[in-house]
Design a protein with these regions (language model features):
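Glycine-rich, aromatic-lined ligand/substrate-binding cores of catalytic
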Residues: 227-363
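A contiguous strand-loop segment
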Residues: 2-128, 148-291
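Short, well-ordered beta-strand elements within core beta-sheets of diverse protein domains
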Residues: 132-138
Length: 506
């Protein structure tokens, strides 16, 4: 999917959490209703079949339950997208990335071939539709996630290029697919953050270390903390055989070897990375002007950086909502060169289906340390809502999305607020800003309230009940605030109707 991702290492976050967040965006002209649910072990298939590629995969018989943000309308597969499992491992998938003809010629994508001219159909590989569902219920650490997905890629292949994040309380790993069957993964440095548009991103990779460490891939973090890179066992031979290393000094740059630097990247991808880095490291580099070290068109923007200050949930939400505020590229701007407005693809685009931010907090019991923050529709106009992730069910307002447009669904209310506020931007934006601040503030307040209650309760059943109670109270608060904001932006837009007339009845 055309998404945007940010990953925050535990020493780069404001409270020692690992954080992974991704905008899940539909293709241009499409909008995909989503819902936030829990998948129980008995609901997980034992034989998985992909709708898109028809690939069939036998799954282990001992799945864990997990949260999920699947498609709400049947017909195109699950697209579970993001979630946390019972082992407190988080995952978001996928960030569609790019490649180049050299890679795709050497290891072609595995695409579905329908039956034709007397030949039987040939199943394709795995893709975004499948990845969370066939990986997350079976892994007990971020490293295990990399290993399981890597082995599936090698066996079944993939029909698309993807980036996937895995997270536990100690580490975040980022895996990128290479061609149809190859892959590499890099640990996010604890003190750094990573930004990812729809482009292969890893720019440094110690291939020799990755290959030396193969026997230690399965070691827990506590046993081998120095694991930084993982990859396909034959990646070195694959690179050499196909002359993929373009470096002059012999130091592999994966972005040059496996990625793209197309004209389309310079309006669709690199500007997004530039804006996020510029926002979180405004003084570290020169981002603007004739002396800029990096511009929206730069192909060498860093994959990761150490932030100038600790990164908060609010920071993540802001950059993932951005439409280039403060620059001449802002489509809503009334300043700067008019021709530049909307020149680049916004991060907070109109066709965002949802945003998920998984926050794994330190120093807390494992049944309440993980918060899954969820937002629906365009981030420029929506709100990010926290929920305890170790749960058996989710509130109806977030889980009952259907094809029908209704104010009983937070997904549809968020879509309506976004469309109306966009069309009445100047008069509605202050309603949106107040809505966002109120929900974020009250969300923090309610989580703090229930954290304190949970700290005093030791009974497991009562603790589960408290988490459900917290999530429902948060959902009720959000429903009230969203309804109020919908009313306000509807009023503002109604006043701008073309058939308005300033004179009233005598």
């Amino acid at each position: 999917m055309p998404c945007t991702t940010i990953l925050v290492g535990k020493n780069a976050s404001y409270d020692g959490s690992t954080m992974i967040a991704r905008n899940d965006d539909s293709a241009s002209g499409h909008f995909t209703p989503k819902k936030f649910v829990v998948v129980h072990p008995e609901e997980q298939p034992r034989k998985y079949k992909s709708v898109i590629s028809h690939v069939e995969i036998d799954l282990p018989d001992d799945p864990m339950g997990y949260t999920s943000v699947p498609n709400a309308v049947d017909g195109e597969g699950l697209w579970a997208a993001s979630g946390v499992n019972e082992a407190n491992v988080g995952m978001t998938a996928t960030e569609t990335i790019t490649s180049n003809p050299r890679v795709l010629g050497a290891d072609p994508l595995v695409t579905y071939q329908p039956a034709k001219d007397g030949k039987e159909e040939a199943a394709g590989g795995i893709g975004e539709e499948d990845i969370v569902s066939i990986v997350l219920p079976y892994i007990h650490s971020a490293r295990e996630g990399v290993i399981r997905l890597g082995s599936i890629l090698e066996k079944y292949g993939t029909y698309e290029m993807n980036g996937i994040a895995f997270q536990d309380q100690n580490e975040i790993w980022w895996l990128e697919t290479i061609g149809g069957h190859h892959w590499m993964a890099r640990k996010v440095p604890d003190e750094a953050y990573v930004v990812m548009p729809n482009q292969l991103g890893i720019d440094k990779f110690d291939l020799e270390k990755a290959l030396r460490d193969q026997e230690k891939y399965r070691c827990p973090c506590e046993e081998y903390a120095d694991l930084e890179y993982m990859c396909s066992a034959d990646l070195k031979e694959f690179i050499s055989k196909n002359h993929l290393d373009l470096s002059m000094d012999g130091v592999l740059n994966p972005r040059d070897a496996f990625g793209s630097h197309d004209d389309s990247d310079h309006v669709y991808n690199t500007p997004r990375a530039w804006y996020m880095l510029r926002n979180l490291n405004p003084k570290t580099k020169i981002w603007d002007g004739v002396n800029a070290e990096f511009t929206p068109y730069s192909d060498d923007l860093p994959w990761c950086m150490i932030p100038e200050k600790k990164i908060t949930v609010e920071d993540v939400k802001y950059v993932l909502s951005s439409h280039y505020q403060g620059t001449s590229y802002d489509p809503y701007a009334s300043y700067g060169e008019k021709e530049q407005r909307g020149a680049f693809r916004s991060i907070g685009v109109n066709r965002t289906d949802f945003l998920s931010l998984i926050q794994m907090r330190l120093g807390m019991e494992k049944d309440c340390n993980i918060l899954e923050w969820v937002a629906f529709a365009s981030n420029a106009f929506n709100v990010l809502v926290p929920f305890y992730a170790t749960i058996d069910t989710t509130p109806d307002y977030f889980s009952s999305t259907t094809r029908e447009v209704t104010t009983d669904s937070f997904y549809w209310v968020s879509r309506m607020i976004g469309a109306m506020a966009d069309a009445s931007y100047k008069s509605s934006i202050f309603h949106i800003e107040r809505y966002q601040e109120r929900v974020m503030s009250k969300g923090h307040q309610l989580i703090g309230k229930y954290d304190a209650l949970l700290e005093k309760e030791s009974d497991a059943a009562k603790r589960m009940s408290l988490r459900h109670q917290a999530n429902q109270e948060i959902a009720d608060m959000v429903k009230k605030e969203a309804s109020d904001t919908l009313n306000k932006v509807l009023y503002e837009l109604s006043n701008q109707m073309k058939n308005a007339y300033s004179r009233s009845d005598a």
